[in-house]
Amino acid sequence: MHLRSTPQQQRLRSELRSYFAELVPENAYARHAEPARQKEFYRRTVRRLGSDGWLGVGWPTEYGGRGLTPAEQFVFFDEAAQAGVPLPLMALNTVGPTIMQFGTEEQKAYFLPRILSGEIDFAIGYSEPDAGTDLAALRTRAVRDGDTYVVNGQKIWTTNGDTADWVWLAVRTDPDAPPHKGISMLLVPTDDPGYSCTVIRTLAGHDTTASYYENVRVPVSRRVGAENEGWRLITTQLNHERVTLAAHGTMAIRALRDVRDWAARTRLDDGRRVIDLGWVRRRLAAAHVRLEAMRLLNWRMVDALQRSALTPQDASAVKVYGSEARREVYAWLMEVAAAAGPLREGSAGAVLHGELERGYRSAVIFTFGGGNNEIQREIISWIGLGMPRVRR
């Protein structure tokens, strides 16, 4: 594979850099680091992106997108990540494409334009207190009652469950079927009186929620795909999510650049610059190598997408490498920043307005978001390498 940007990709990257610099001024995300302000900043920015026509750059034109190639779509996500632009990744790259493939015409007509405009956002309702890694063990029930389902149950780690407009909800519609059967996908509005959630504060500085469903009535018309065949939709959506999480890992490239610049202008008591220390250069070099390898893997993934040849094991491999590279690079950058690294926003001497510390704490999320990395390794060994499947 020959890696060279086309003139169109170069123009797109240049246009995006100028646009994102105006949309999200330098260090804007750090200035909105308090959770409530983060969420308001996120929704405002997403609506602006939608009104300016920048959401869905890779969506087909028939659904209101720009119809750009996977390579050009990756350029968009790459530049957005490095500029610190928040994106509705679940709605844009997971739920939307799955509705395109499996949804009814009515569902497409209602949801897709609203996703592209930034009007609605989604949370993912998969994991449960007793069904996380083993997702097929989910128990949230949906009982058919005429033209509606009555939903009862609980989900956990429902990111954006307190701010999203809809939940992409996995429910069990046939309790007597085998674990991977009898699951259906429903579109559940969060303004239903039977929906509630509790915010969970995490050490990573990332809010998530536990969400509850008490006699929530969902029209059958809001079921995506056939009844009891939701597992196929879940795996389709998770492949999209794993690819998205890998692309999102390019945020570490910006962190590396910023820490390198900080080390070049910061002097020690003896007058030497931080970057003049041999071990610092080795750490920065190692981080560059890891991120360059991640970039090449991402482009290999994009090439497979363009050829419609992306396999589950390839998606898992890119997700594992990208998420672990991001975590490792942030750890190395924290070493370089030394005592100033752990300082949060607002503290005297905080590196990069506290963004480095926040990025270090949040990096761990990507190792289990979209599927725990240990499970991804099992997918790689079982499907990709033909090794015996792990027994559970």
Which positions does each model-derived feature cover?
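A structural signal for short hydrophobic beta-strand segments in well-ordered beta-sheet cores
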Residues: 140-143
